[in-house]
């Protein structure tokens, strides 16, 4: 049986997973660093890298035990090798390459974004091609996923990522870290029509997005309010989340038009939303409705596979393993690595 070991360390979560050739997840362990970064209100790169050093060995042992697997049973080792916090990426990549060398097993360098892009093929086994909205704390882009290693970016944020906007607004409201889930929770208690926020470049006619002006508008509102209580916080959260939904819905329509122009694909109408923001249930509902209007089906992974995890890295490794796309051990990890720059 083919077993793929996946290692993910692009930011502040240490993750290790083992999956089989049949897309069965035998074990998927994530060691969170939230408690280490909460006091700073965000991720501290040096702390993240040092924590990966202390967590990786433990995570690997737990995954092997939980999956009843020996290291010698592993067919190949796949590890995130960019993009991300370079210190964190190096730690995970070096750990994986050391295992590869010691075990004499192939190594596969995985682009973290490709891991997110292919998650829907792990969970739903959807065919190529499909339209992807990758929405996380570090990225926000529409991508035509044409095949393994074949990606066309249709549009992206010109400033902040949508996940970053969620986290920054949560910090303005003194909510806990990470901020995205806190905004979503508070939004269920608030009035989404209480405050009107701008929707930057929503009528640009292309797939690019902007969230910096929205974030600034929220900050300005908070500074001008005389009192900030729970009701106000809930209303701001709801109004902010509603505006994000409006922006993404509009841009999904632009992305569908751009996607259909380059694919001529009218029988496999799938839109995938991946990344941490894909876990937001409100956005799932809004974008599902938008997709349905155009005859598309919106697919999103289970919540535990929306955020950073190693199962998606292992699966991307499986697709590359099946195509004999291995990586030399002298591969240099990358802080920046576009999906369009992936080489097969």
UniProtKB/Swiss-Prot annotation:
Listed name of the protein: tRNA N6-adenosine threonylcarbamoyltransferase
CDD domains assigned: ASKHA_NBD_TsaD_bac (cd24133)
Residue numbers binding Fe cation: 112, 116, 308
Catalyzed reactions: L-threonylcarbamoyladenylate + adenosine(37) in tRNA = N(6)-L-threonylcarbamoyladenosine(37) in tRNA + AMP + H(+)
One GO-annotated biological process of the protein: tRNA threonylcarbamoyladenosine modification
Keyword entries, A-Z: Acyltransferase, Cytoplasm, Iron, Metal-binding, Transferase, tRNA processing
Organism lineage string: Bacteria, Pseudomonadati, Pseudomonadota, Alphaproteobacteria, Rickettsiales
Binding of substrate, residues: 134-138, 167, 180, 280
Pfam families assigned to the protein according to its UniProt record, in alphabetical order: TsaD
Localization terms from the record: Cytoplasm
Endpoints of the signal sequence: none
Gene designation per UniProt: tsaD
Cofactor binding, per record: Binds 1 Fe(2+) ion per subunit.
Taxonomic source organism: Rickettsia massiliae (strain Mtu5)
Function: Required for the formation of a threonylcarbamoyl group on adenosine at position 37 (t(6)A37) in tRNAs that read codons beginning with adenine. Is involved in the transfer of the threonylcarbamoyl moiety of threonylcarbamoyl-AMP (TC-AMP) to the N6 group of A37, together with TsaE and TsaB. TsaD likely plays a direct catalytic role in this reaction.
EC number: 2.3.1.234
Database matches in NCBIfam families: gcp_kae1 (TIGR00329), T6A_TsaD_YgjD (TIGR03723)
GO cellular component terms given for this protein: cytoplasm
